[in-house]
Regions:
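Carbohydrate-associated surface elements
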Residues: 220, 243
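Acidic donor-binding loop of glycosyltransferase active sites
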Residues: 212, 344-359, 374
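N-terminal subdomain of nucleotide-sugar transferases
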Residues: 2-113
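A charged, aromatic-enriched C-terminal amphipathic alpha-helix characteristic of glycosyltransferases
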Residues: 401-405, 418-447
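Membrane-proximal helix-turn-helix segments that form the acceptor-binding/catalytic region
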Residues: 162-165, 169-173, 196-216
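Nucleotide-sugar donor phosphate/pyrophosphate-binding loop at the beta->alpha transition
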Residues: 91, 174-179, 187-207, 246
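Conserved donor-binding/catalytic core segment of Leloir-type glycosyltransferases
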Residues: 52, 260-279, 285-288
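Nucleotide-activated donor-binding/catalytic signature segment of Leloir-type glycosyltransferases, i.e.
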Residues: 301, 306-339
Length: 450
């Protein structure tokens, strides 16, 4: 009972803070926001533009959403910007990979973390992607960080899209442009890991109207929003795609790795990344089993290696497969990014497992797969990723329902040399999709918004 009362009181405090935040913004108040302090960036020149970047996850926390904000922060500093990051509280102990990624950033990047939200009543507060109680803490952290060094522009990267709402208040407070960056969609083609209730939809439309620019990672996402949101200004909706970082490949030049015929002469087909609901292995394992039953000779010619963390719900599928064909797949736990890149470089081919979520977007993994140089086996029925691999001549696309086509793809990969898949189109595409080139495009947007 005491816990229920405590959560109810915390919820009332959150609502009061929300009301104060909205009133202070409307009144253009000079009220000082509270904050938790942080690592204040070293000022490298008062004339340098100052970017305030909202990203709920940031190193040493590590997940698929951190790489784009990290890359922008790194290359913005190199381009002469000052960068302050407002981010969420750390969850758990940082991993070695997360610490390595943090250490890759210039020391002048300021990182300010929101305080953890107090436990509150789910029933008493509006529902929003990322959690309504988190709006105030990250806004407070950002405003405190920039109190004596106002930003030139504010960029909010989502999901979670709670950052968009917080960033809007801070941009209004400092009277600077707000740029929204959609790494995934919010209320249009909503992915399963994003909330899109009534509160989300109301605020998304409000923010899309007020933002100075809206950045999407694919033209398909931009088009979907323009078709779905009435009155959305097409002139301020831009595309800056994801990319790959050449600095991840500095050990050897891109494409220099030799084809992998390791493991006693077998062709190694590698999946590198997290196995979960966006990369489900069960359909692939079923088709692979059908191929091996029908073509025993392939058991001695190839092996599929899965490197990376695996969701518990799919461990049964792996166990079932290994009980029948123990020498045809290999399971490797998560590794640091440098080791993951090395695995991609050594592989004879790279496996991409795609859910229908990727029909309108391209997984970040594909950019690194393309840079690694090996042929790519896309196991998917539809989507932009398969279209891109076909267009670049970088691999093969196999539908999820046909083991005969999967068998044909295996035989094709075994027959063709690695160089067959390294087309001029692939090389040219990589040059225009490096993280440095794309950061330059984003910084141009941030420099020109008003």
């Amino acid at each position: 009972m005491l816990d229920i009362v405590r959560k109810a009181l915390n919820s009332l405090r959150v609502l009061a803070s929300w009301a104060n935040l909205r009133l202070s913004t409307i009144a253009s108040s000079k009220r000082s926001f509270g904050g938790n302090g942080g690592v204040r960036p070293k000022i490298v020149g008062s004339e340098a533009p100052h970017l305030l970047l909202f990203a709920w996850s940031f190193p040493p926390e590590i997940n698929g959403g951190v790489y784009r904000p990290v890359s922008l922060a790194k290359y913005a500093v190199r381009a002469g910007w000052r960068v302050t990051v407002a981010t969420g509280p750390l969850k758990g102990a940082p991993s070695a990979a997360g610490i390595d990624l943090l250490n890759s950033l210039p020391g002048t990047v300021g990182i300010f973390r929101a305080l953890p939200a107090a436990p509150s009543s789910y029933k008493l507060l509006p529902k929003v992607d990322g959690g309504f109680p988190n709006i105030i803490p990250i806004a407070e952290a950002a405003a405190a960080a920039c109190e004596h060094d106002p930003p030139t522009a504010v960029l909010a990267s989502g999901p979670p899209f709670v950052t968009f709402i917080s960033a809007n208040f801070v941009a209004t407070r400092f009277r600077v442009p707000l740029v929204l960056e959609y790494r995934d969609e919010w209320s249009v083609h909503t992915p399963g890991f994003v909330t899109a209730g009534a509160f989300d939809k109301k605020w998304e439309r409000k923010l899309l109207r007020s933002a100075s620019a809206v950045v999407f990672v694919t033209e398909a996402s931009r088009k979907a929003y323009l078709e779905s949101i009435d009155g959305l200004d097409a002139s301020k909706c831009l595309v800056v795609p994801n990319g790959w970082d050449p600095e991840d490949f500095v050990v050897e030049p891109v494409f220099s790795a030799t084809s992998s015929v390791e493991n006693h002469g077998k062709l190694v087909i590698s999946f590198v990344g997290s196995i979960g609901w966006l990369a489900k292995p069960d359909a692939f394992l079923t088709r692979f089993q059908e191929v091996l039953v029908r073509c025993p000779s392939l058991r001695e010619r190839l092996i599929v290696r899965f490197t990376g963390p695996k969701s518990d719900e799919f461990r049964g599928a792996f166990s079932s497969f290994q009980s029948q064909f123990p020498n045809s797949i290999e399971l490797v736990d998560g590794v640091p990014k440098s080791a993951a890149i090395a695995e991609m470089r050594r592989a004879g081919a790279l496996l991409l497992l795609l859910d229908s979520f990727y029909d309108t977007t391209i997984p970040g993994k594909l950019y690194e797969y393309l840079a690694a140089g090996a042929p790519i086996l896309v196991f998917s029925d539809t989507g932009l990723a398969g279209d891109l691999v076909r267009r670049l001549g970088a691999g093969l696309v196999v539908p999820t329902h046909d083991s005969f086509l999967l068998e044909a793809a295996f035989l094709h990969l075994l027959q063709e040399p690695r160089g067959h898949w390294q087309s001029p189109d692939r090389t040219a595409w990589l040059e225009t999709h490096s993280r440095s080139a794309l950061a330059t495009r984003m910084l141009k947007v941030l420099s020109e918004v008003r």
